[in-house]
Amino acid sequence: MTTNNLIDIALHIPTPDAALTVAYSPIRLNLAGRQPLELRLTAPASGHKLPIVILSHGYGPSNYLPSKDGYAPLAQFWAERGFAVIQPTHASSRVGGLPAETEGAPFFWRERVEEVRAILDRLIEVEGQAPAVAGRLDHGSIAAVGHSLGGHTVSLLLGARLHGEVSGDSRISAGILLTAPGRGGKDLTDENEARFPFFDLDFAHLVTPSLVVCGADDNPRFTSRGPEWHADAYHDGPGARALLTLHGVGHGLGGIAGLDAKETEVEVPDGLEATKRMTLAWLRTILGYDAAAWTSACAALAGPASTLGQVEEKSSG
């Protein structure tokens, strides 16, 4: 939506006006030995050389939102402002994922990475199923964004490693980690260390330029640490250039998975709007479409919108 009477302070963060979009769903990619991978593609109705964002959903408590059909607040906002957003229904999805008896269930962390890689491999095929978008995407300008478990997926694609295993993909030029899991192993409770051995990522190889986003009121149940656990990729990953901490919001960052959703501990329209505007500004700058977007957004967050959050950045030197 473009008119929103519920936001106030976030209006200080500059952002482009919304433009008309088109959406295609379901786009299907046949994969060997399993059901097709289903996607949603939302893109500007006009323009060429559109940058691409692949948005990886979380695991979440809902049946439907952790799929290609969730995260409309983010996907629509970005598409209205120049990005082609591709959303897979991952193998872990309750509504459209792989059967529960399949190896790797229920989280399918390896399969999720391979699903994103399949999208990258077959972008021309994706475009071919979206006639109004075909030929308009910039295959050399791709960002990956992941929320929660999707942040784990994207961390691997950005270069993080699990026990030395290399999963990074150089076709991805930039990333955003939205309340992604932090360090695994002994940083987890005993129960969760046993349940989530794949959280034990080494972020030292995360070299792709990235933004890490955390909710100051997040309550990570996997660890005895506090919300700062979700910022580990920023502190450990050389490519993680900035840390955005949003005040007054938790794991759902004010409602990114869906409006009025149980994924959102507390619905905060200004917090959600700040998430949308700040992530858009990062994408526009890091992919080379507006050199001043991120600087201007950070200035607003440090000034008239300071109650909404803060940004920490590593020195360029």
What does each of the following model-derived ranges do?
Residues 167-248:
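The feature captures the conserved acid-bearing segment of alpha/beta-hydrolase catalytic domains
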Residues 104-139:
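Alpha/beta-hydrolase active-site loop
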Residues 49-58:
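Short beta-strand element of the alpha/beta-hydrolase
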Residues 65-88:
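Short amphipathic alpha-helix adjacent to the substrate-entry channel of hydrolases
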Residues 248-250, 256-317:
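Alpha/beta-hydrolase-fold serine-hydrolase catalytic core, especially in secreted/extracellular enzymes
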Residues 57, 146-152:
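Conserved alpha/beta-hydrolase "nucleophile elbow" surrounding the catalytic nucleophile
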Residues 124, 151-165:
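Short glycine-enriched nucleophile-adjacent loop
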Residues 1-48:
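N-terminal cap/lid segment of alpha/beta-hydrolase-fold proteins
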